[in-house]
A protein has these predicted regions:
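Class I S-adenosyl-L-methionine-dependent methyltransferase catalytic core
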Residues: 1-189
């Protein structure tokens, strides 16, 4: 696994090799990032952005965001081996001042006081494929008003997962890659 773009482009990062993790494939990651950087309807300016990476695993997506100029990425992961690898990756890239890692279940992210009053540009959700109840997380994001006016939520799921995003979001764009689907959500104003 490697960083695809930005200031860390080409640097190999550590990854997990066990049954408890499902790394974000480079093809899918690159497609998401290209949409975020170049599309008209789903564009994010990574420079000085604030990003929340829930179910972050070893951090490849959030680290890509830092490589492209994000001011801070908040990583939430509760699997100890993934956290260990994520911290090794952060250290390898020397981006400790731009990364904040929480050993916390992503479903409880809203309890974290460090996110209070933050306005995020992008929230990336990459839950285990068997996890279907993302609506709870989306409701908490809306309740806390975490997204900036033009902020986006990107959701990586299994293509057969039923979608229920609640009343606060609309699908801005979606795509399928093999058994994965990517959904870009915008809040309804």
């Amino acid at each position: 696994m490697r960083i695809i773009g930005g200031s860390f482009k080409g640097i190999k990062i550590f990854e997990a090799f066990d049954k408890n993790t499902r790394p974000l494939r480079d093809l899918v990651k690159e497609s998401i990032l290209n949409i975020l950087e170049y599309s008209k309807d789903s564009k994010i300016n990574f420079n000085n952005s604030l990003i929340l990476d829930l179910f972050s695993g070893t951090g490849s997506f959030g680290l890509e965001c830092i490589s492209r100029g994000a001011a801070k990425v908040y990583f939430f992961e509760n699997y100890n081996q993934s956290i260990e690898i994520l911290n090794k990756n952060i250290k390898k890239l020397k981006c400790e001042n731009k990364a904040r890692v929480f050993n916390q279940n992503a479903f409880n992210f809203f309890e974290n006081k460090e996110l209070k009053n933050k306005k995020l540009d992008l929230i990336f959700l990459d839950p285990p494929y068997k996890e279907e109840n993302i609506k709870v997380i989306l409701e908490n994001i809306a309740k806390l008003k975490l997204l900036k006016e033009n902020g986006l939520i990107v959701l990586h799921r299994h293509k057969k997962t039923k979608d229920d995003f609640g009343k606060n979001y609309t699908i801005n764009r979606s795509a399928r890659y093999g058994i994965s689907k990517i959904i870009f959500l915008k809040k309804i104003n």
